[in-house]
Structure formats: C-alpha cells, structure tokens
Amino acid sequence: MCGRYTLKTRAEVLAEHFELPEVPWFEPRYNIAPTQPVAVVRAGSEGGGRELSMLRWGLIPSWADDPSIGNRMINARAETVAEKSAYRSAFRHRRCLVPADGFYEWAKANGAKQPHYFQLKDGGPFAFAGLWERWSKGEKPIESCTLLTTEANKVVSPVHDRMPIILEPKDYGGWLDPQRQRLEDVSAILRPFPAERMVAYPVGRWVNDPRHDDPRCVEPAT
C-alpha cells in the first residue's frame, strides 16, 4: 500500500511534463499523507486539454453515506478495480494522473518499521495512475481520489509486495482517454514500472509522523 509520497518538483517543470498551460506555485511537499488535498491532472472540464485540480486523497464513493469511508480508500488494486463497486464508475469515467517524484514504503526491521524512499534514477517527476470521484451527499460536494497499485517490481519487493502504478509519459493520454472504459483497453499500461529505472534507500523515521513535511523526510538513514 502506498500511503505517503513527495512532490518537490518546480511548478514550471510540472507544467511542461504534464502539458498544462500553467501550474500555480506551491510549497514543495516531502510527506503527502491520506486525507490531505493533493494535486491531480485530469481531462479538462471544457472538453479539451488537461487541468490541474486539488482533490482529497482517499476516494469517497458517490453512494457512500459517510465521507469518512474515504479515509481507508487511498489505494485500489488494478487487478480488480473494474469490478469493485467503490471504483467501477470512476474507472470507466473519471481517471486522473497524480503528480509525484517519489514515494515511501515501510519494511519490518529488528522489530520496528524502517521507511524507504523510492524515486526514478533521474529524480524527475512522474504520474501515478489515479481515479477520482465526486461525493454530493453533504452540504458541500467533495472531490476525492485514489491511487492504483500493482505487484511490486524488484526494487520495491524487498520492502513491500505492492507498489503504486507509475505511468510512462507516453501513456498519459491513453489513461485519460474517456473512450477506453474497459480494463482490457488499458491493462497493458497498468503494470509494474521497470525496476532498472528506479532507486531506493532507507530514510530516517522522521517521515513516520505526517506532521513532518520538510527535506529531513528524504534524508538517508544514518
């Protein structure tokens, strides 16, 4: 399960990478956690291009009576996402890209959990495959999202058996394409990211507390 990630990349780099007209300046994020507002890229509401939006991390199904159900729906398994009632409609109609440049997983070591940080070898930005949903049963509508996961590659598997799906830039358009509504239409891109293009290292336990959101989170463990 992916429950923390980073987004430190400059706004102008993100705008170019995701083919957005602009990305507002934002504080670098070193410890993004569930229920927080997160940046997502989705098909433009006016029928063309892409737009950047801020959504709550933890998908709230449209049929839910209590929005707190989203607190635990931060990940969706790619293998079953087209079948699960919580995600079925979003998978067909509301896919998104979730910008990031690294993520954390925890491994058990000497009776404690040791956090590890994963990123691309070039340190650049990438996109998680995501879904988004609108919940309208409260006083104010809530838009929320979840990250798709798959089996871990050889870099992640020593720490965890699952990993978030990192999409290739050439597949961004295909993932956002509203005409591709079946799992078989996109199954080829919902795969583990190539291990040879990733690196990982253990970091200090400072990141364990989601209130800590600074460069110390990604410092190598000593």
Model-predicted regions and their roles:
Residues 1-222:
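Short linear sequence motif anchored by a di-proline
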